[in-house]
Amino acid sequence: MLFGAAYYTEYQPYERLAQDLDLMAEAGFSVIRVGESVWSTWEPREGHFELDWLQPVLDAAHDRGIKAIVGTPTYAVPPWLRRKYPETAARSGTGQPIPYGMRQDADYSHPAFRHLAERLVRTIVGRYADHPAVIGWQVDNEPGLRIFHNDAVFQGFLDHLRDRYGDVETLNRRWGLTYWSHRLQDWADLWPPDGNTTPSYDLAWRRYQSRLTQEYITWHAALVRGLVPEDQFVTTCVALGQQGLDISAIGRPLDVAGANIYYATQDGLALPGSDEPDGGLYPFFVSWSGPAWLYLQNDMARGIRQEPFLVMETNATSIGGSADNFPLYKGQARQAVWSMVARGARMIEYWHWHSLHYGAETYWGGILGHSLEPGRTYDELAAIAGEFRQAGSAIEGLRPRSDVAMLLSADSRWAMEFMGPLRGNSPAWFGDPQSYERIVAAFYRGLFDAGLSVDIVSPEQLPSSPEELVERRPVLVVPALYIAEDATLDLLRRYAEAGGHLVLTPRTGYADEEAVARHTVMPGALRPAAGAYYQEFTNVLTPVTITQRDANGPALHGHATAWADGLIAEGATVLAGYDHPHLGQFAAITTHEYGSGRVTYVGTVPDRELSRSLADWLAGVSLPADAWREDRPPTVTCTSATTAHGAVLRFVHNWAWDPVDYRLPGDVRDLFTGESVAAGTALELGPWDVRLLVEDDTGAPSGTRIDPAPAAPITPTSPSPRRTP
């Protein structure tokens, strides 16, 4: 397990390299990330490279047993590049170059940019690839932030459309361009995307932008991989919500996935916390608060490649702008770290070592504050590093255990950003661009509250065999799969037929792969499997109480929010309806045995109470009983992973100020104290506390102890098929 921080000696106000690295070594840090943000330092003038400045950093790290990930500094271009090559500036709209002064303002598909970037990368990698401290390379940083409107990008988009559709008549038909007199007679007739109102156009444009990002990272990774030794890995730093990015696609050219995991802190990390899934007073880029948001990001990061991942950046203390000052309460950093480990992280790296004294991120806090003196943050992280050393082999090669899977779709997210079904804070013709995230959050949060762990998977990652899908994913929740190919819907149907429990939600299957609404009674191809249909739907402005309809069924309770499909059962059992004079004629939730499996249709966006009760029922009807999740205080969560030795490692958290007792369902051993604790014992959890408990470690090889034996840092090696972490 690697543990460390991004380190920028070039940002320090005075020379303190030895002091910084000594502090890291004393804290037990094992890795740093360096060099990724300063093209103008590496190449202050075109063709003039200054490479020596990193040598003492890597040497000092190596002398202290600290490894390094070197970043290629291509995401923040120097002023001379913008001045001499203005054509490389990214356009935020047709003819509208992004003003210089931030970062990620270059079109990385432009040949001039690629030429300059390749020369830079070859020079840096050639100098440092053989340094003994270097274990891997981060190519670029947080790609996909921008949507490029450059002329050459638009022409490339036209070429892409020609290849895909062949002729304009096919495009006219597939996109429905008869509407509003948009029919093309020639490819030159296609208008720029700035004023576009056609959903099919926008979806194709967003897919093309994602393709540009993937092609760039593929090019970049191949370039570096061809220059470095076999035992060094290639990754990038994925910001999970970038608009020009499909996270499952970006993982393909990488050896190991790397992601940012940022989360709300202080009371924003409390459980139960707020019922509303939004960030409130927390940093603008944190979509909503509570530990469920933290776990969703962990699961998304693992879903990039369906493999363990690296946390490239996470909170050290306050994150965000000058008015986002929410340092973590004591214990919260430890809780967050162990949640990441439980869900597959093989490295935890903080952004960053020291708070900057200048620049846009002056108040994005580092491990050391502006005083550069160790304080509470440093002490708490050093204690975590000590726990890593103490845990030793027990946390090497952990395999997260999951109960259900959730299907997330980049296409559906993009389509709903353009034409969202839910209403936002103010009326808008095209709805709330956060509609997809709101629907996903509603269902994920219910699963989390019910104690269920989730695997995130994309449509492209589904196996073609429904039997294999059932074996790997006995319950599959499909939130808002608005864009779906016929083949995907058929696989979902066959999945249920083969024995899986398929959970459908509003908007699933409504449009085809071109974002064209299907001309069939919904849910279309899934109607026979669902045993229910609908022909009308409505936005819901005020929460509507859900009523139980099946006297022998689950006691579902809570409210319908935001949306309601007017479900009519035709063979399905109606589990719940609406307490409403109009909606009361429809079902809210149905379930239908189909083949060897089951399809449950949830026709609304559930509030937290309804989502939790629904998840409890799903677990009861489709999953083995698990006392670890079924009898917990409301502030406690329990997740688990299988160790390399076959034992089960339980991570028991208390996400609150008040201490709490958790009665253990089974015999365990405390990972850190070695104490054996019998089933039925009240485990004491302090404020913002986490306990690691080993259950059934009889599978450890003879002579092996799952105990405090120190272990060397894990060095990721080999992608698929060449390198793995």
Predicted regions and their residues:
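Short, acidic/polar
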Residues: 11-26, 117-123, 239-248, 329-337, ...
